[in-house]
Amino acid sequence: MKETLRPGATKTKRLTVDRERTISFMGEEGRVYATPSLIGDIEGTCRELLLDHADTDEESVGMEISLRHLAPTLLDMQVEITAWVVAVDGRKVLFEISAKDEVEPIATSTHTRFVVDVAKRQERLKAKAAKRTAVRAG
């Protein structure tokens, strides 16, 4: 991780709430930004911020998220998500996030990500897959 990753670093992402990001269970007129989609977009914004400061052999994974989804956002509305680094503790990074649509604030969140070495992570995943195979074999 580069020394440039410090508290105060920010990233803003703008997107349009498309059909895939909405709920469907309230009919066509009830299509609004789904909470799971909002969480995914928040995680993506934080990940992009980290990648701006990561070495080429690094990636990040989510550890924890807390979200207050404050207001509905209609299909085809514009959303702006802003994430900022609050703390860096070794490879663990804490973010605060705000999101707003064209009319009002829609969410506040905190999110923690962990910076990982890609090659080491792949080895851990291979080891877990081998254990899974052994467990399934009985």
Positions of PLM-derived features:
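HotDog/MaoC-like acyl-thioester-processing domains
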Residues: 75, 84-138
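Generic structural detector for well-ordered beta-strands
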Residues: 3, 12-18, 68, 84, ...
